[in-house]
Amino acid sequence: MIKYGTSGFRTHHSVILDISEKIGLALAQLVYYKKESFGIMITASHNHHEDNGVKIMDENGNMVTEDIERYLVQYVNDQFTNDNMPYEPLIKIFNEDIQIIKNKNLKLHIGYDSRQSSPDICEKIIKGILRTNDQFPYIVHPLVTTPELHFIF
């Protein structure tokens, strides 16, 4: 089981790569249900070079709430049952709902640093986002630091 640490998930890059598509799916669904933008920063700053991670931030650039942390942990670890799922499970977001998201200027911001595994993790996150709808709005900010993504976002 992968655990949520300070602001996100960090471990060996291969584990992060394995859960990246689920992270994209989960965050796209959060944008849909919460009607707010989120940021995803791919970095493991001070960790070993083989590690990587994803930091999740709310639309104000702050750490997400504990209920969202729990949701993300349960989502990436496949721990949902009908009794504990906080949102209606979905994979597809309808075009009408995408238009509402776009009209409210909501999107996912994805930033990543210079770690070798970061672009591959980003691509898998995007794959998860686009599984919900191929028109889901997102922006990639390559080669940024975490503070830069906070500022952009």
Residues covered by each model-derived region:
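Non-catalytic beta/alpha edge segments that cap or flank active sites
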Residues: 1-153
